[in-house]
Design a protein with these regions (language model features):
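Conserved catalytic core of the tyrosine transesterase superfamily
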Residues: 1-275
């Protein structure tokens, strides 16, 4: 519904009914909140185009989503009623990866072009924690091999960052860029079954499928690209990375998400004395 005319007749009551319909049909609370935000943005644009009344827009904007603290109560009620609680894009729970499994995934055959690409692909997610969309968008020119840095754009927070590459990631970047990467543009080349690497470009979906394939080889069945970011953040939190540094390095716009990793990394019974 990107055409303003398509929004004629959309009311706050319709928006509220849409929220309730999603609740009854098992959509995740986060997904519902995201869709509500999208509806409000488009309703505002439609109002500017004259398709939605200003008063109606005010009422639509007043429709509230669900706060994080409400989610458990909402989901408990839905479970009791036999309604699903996780219909949406994300998995209900991340697949946990051990340090040994992560190391095994990074141990690629660097005598092949596919192995060199996979090693860099995995290193960027496991060692730098980039989102899969950010990884897919990386350009050859984003890598400064001389200074060991990666300069890239984070669309989710609309900012460009520079990250220092650790020794493993820098080595992987040198191996792939000097031997296999395109001269300019998107750095990745897709796989051609039985023939190594093919044409330029890998979608976020293709990267996730590759991660899933490589994860299964080390016993991490169902692994996704987001799980690699989860692993990175978890390891950073467990090694006492300050909250503000984790927020910046992970490209989060608020302290809420990195704060969860810090909280989860705490030893719950630390300081408890029984004698």
């Amino acid at each position: 519904m990107t055409s303003p005319e398509a929004w004629r007749g959309v009311t706050w009551g319709l928006v509220t009914a849409f929220l309730n319909w999603q609740l009854q049909n098992g959509y995740a609370v986060g997904t519902i909140n995201g869709r509500l935000s999208t509806v409000k943005v488009y309703a505002k644009l439609a109002t500017k185009a004259g398709a939605v009344d200003v008063g109606e827009l005010a009422m639509i904007q007043a429709v509230k989503g669900f706060e994080h603290k409400e989610r458990k109560h909402i989901n408990d009620k839905r479970k009791a009623a036999g309604i699903d609680t996780r219909k949406g894009a994300k998995k209900a729970q991340a697949v946990s990866l051990t340090p040994a499994q992560a190391a095994a995934m990074l141990d690629r055959d660097t005598t092949t072009d596919t192995g060199r690409r996979d090693r860099l692909l995995l290193a960027i997610m496991l060692r730098l924690g980039l989102r899969v969309g950010e990884v897919a968008a990386l350009q050859v020119g984003d890598f400064d091999l001389k200074h060991g840095e990666l300069n890239f754009y984070r669309a989710k927070v609309d900012k460009t960052q520079t990250h220092k590459l650790d020794a493993l990631t820098l080595e992987a970047a040198r191996d792939y860029i000097t031997q296999d990467a395109p001269a300019i543009g998107i750095i990745w080349r897709g796989s051609v079954k039985g023939h190594g690497l093919g044409k330029q470009g890998m979608s976020a979906r293709a990267i996730t499928k590759r991660v899933q394939f490589l994860g299964a080889k080390v016993g991490a069945v169902g692994l996704s690209a987001h799980d690699l970011r989860h692993y990175w953040a978890t390891q950073a939190a467990r090694n006492n990375t300050p909250l503000d540094r984790l927020q910046d390095a992970g490209g989060w716009s608020s302290l809420a998400m990195p704060g969860r990793y810090i909280e989860a990394a705490k030893i719950a019974n630390q300081g408890v004395r029984l004698e």
